[in-house]
Curated annotation (Swiss-Prot):
Primary location: cytoplasm
Protein name: Tyrosine--tRNA ligase
Enzyme Commission code(s) on record: 6.1.1.1
Organism expressing this protein natively: Methanocaldococcus jannaschii (strain ATCC 43067 / DSM 2661 / JAL-1 / JCM 10045 / NBRC 100440)
Chemical reaction(s) catalysed: tRNA(Tyr) + L-tyrosine + ATP = L-tyrosyl-tRNA(Tyr) + AMP + diphosphate + H(+)
Molecular-function GO terms, alphabetical: ATP binding; tyrosine-tRNA ligase activity
Length: 306
């Protein structure tokens, strides 16, 4: 697998693929992703970090923006508390094997020049466009705050300030990234990853909703959470267990089953697994048991490093 294919695998889209191929030719290139510091780093975060590791392996310098001011604007707590959580997040990302430069937003977002450029960008952005870009990110929908229109403009400015070639995020970041491509003099390549479905099957996996598997969960916690997770027979779309099987598990995969239910099953690819499950040749509980045990193995090195 070449560098381009390695970066492209398991992404939802790259804007644009041609521009990424040009960036890959550069001797020095950089990519960034921003995270609002979170009390629990879960599989949704891990999926993003896995992509940053792909970029790292393709020769990119990696920048992780610990977006403390963004978290503050999104009503995630007081700044001191958010900063402490960010310090913990850094340790978790390092335990995942990522080698990166870590930057707190508050280290540069309060500078005079940064603030002045936010004002310049604000003059070019309609209120409707700024609000629309926050639809999948904002914490509160019914009574939106002015902070919600400052947030995306700051994120656009972050891309400019950091001077990166590639911006990475989940699909919920797409509208902000498109705004950046329109407003900034340098068109950044945008890599968008899937947004994992929460274990309850309702919306995205989120620490605030409690519908997640944390990367430092114990084996017992992982088994219990997966056992209770939404996983209707034959349904692939919006099935969190199938998503975990697609984005985290390695193949061939052995699914252990009692002899009376057909005995152990070897699955050579995710596509084969999807076909078996869709055709109801694989029971949800057998799938859950296999996914739980494989996930425990995958997360064990991270737990040990922490």
């Amino acid at each position: 697998m070449d560098e381009f294919e390695m970066i492209k695998r398991n992404t939802s889209e790259i804007i644009s693929e041609e521009e990424l191929r040009e960036v890959l030719k550069k001797d020095e290139k950089s990519a960034y992703i921003g995270f609002e510091p979170s009390g629990k780093i879960h599989l949704g975060h891990y999926l993003q970090i896995k992509k940053m590791i792909d970029l790292q392996n393709a020769g990119f310098d990696i920048i992780i923006l610990l977006a403390d001011l963004h978290a503050y604007l999104n009503q995630k707590g007081e700044l001191d508390e958010i900063r402490k959580i960010g310090d913990y997040n850094k340790k978790v990302f390092e335990a995942m094997g990522l080698k990166a430069k870590y930057v707190y937003g508050s280290e540069f977002q309060l500078d005079k020049d940064y603030t002045l450029n936010v004002y310049r960008l604000a003059l070019k952005t309609t209120l409707k466009r700024a609000r629309r870009s926050m639809e999948l990110i904002a914490r509160e929908d019914e009574n939106p705050k002015v902070a919600e229109v400052i947030y995306p403009i700051m994120q656009v400015n972050d891309i400019h300030y950091l001077g990166v070639d590639v911006a990475v995020g989940g699909m919920e970041q797409r509208k902000i990234h498109m705004l950046a491509r329109e407003l900034l003099p340098k068109k950044v390549v945008c890599i968008h990853n899937p947004v994992l479905t929460g274990l309850d099957g309702e919306g995205k996996m989120s620490s605030s909703k409690g519908n997640f598997i944390a990367v430092d969960d114990s084996p017992e916690e992982i088994r219990a959470k997966i056992k209770k997770a939404y996983c209707p027979a034959g349904v692939v779309e919006g099935n969190p267990i199938m998503e975990i099987a697609k984005y985290f598990l390695e193949y061939p995969l052995t699914i252990k089953r009692p002899e009376k239910f057909g005995g152990d099953l070897t699955v050579n690819s995710y596509e084969e697994l999807e076909s078996l499950f869709k055709n109801k040749e694989l029971h949800p509980m057998d799938l859950k048991n296999a996914v739980a045990e494989e996930l425990i193995k995958i997360l064990e090195p991270i737990r040990k490093r922490l």
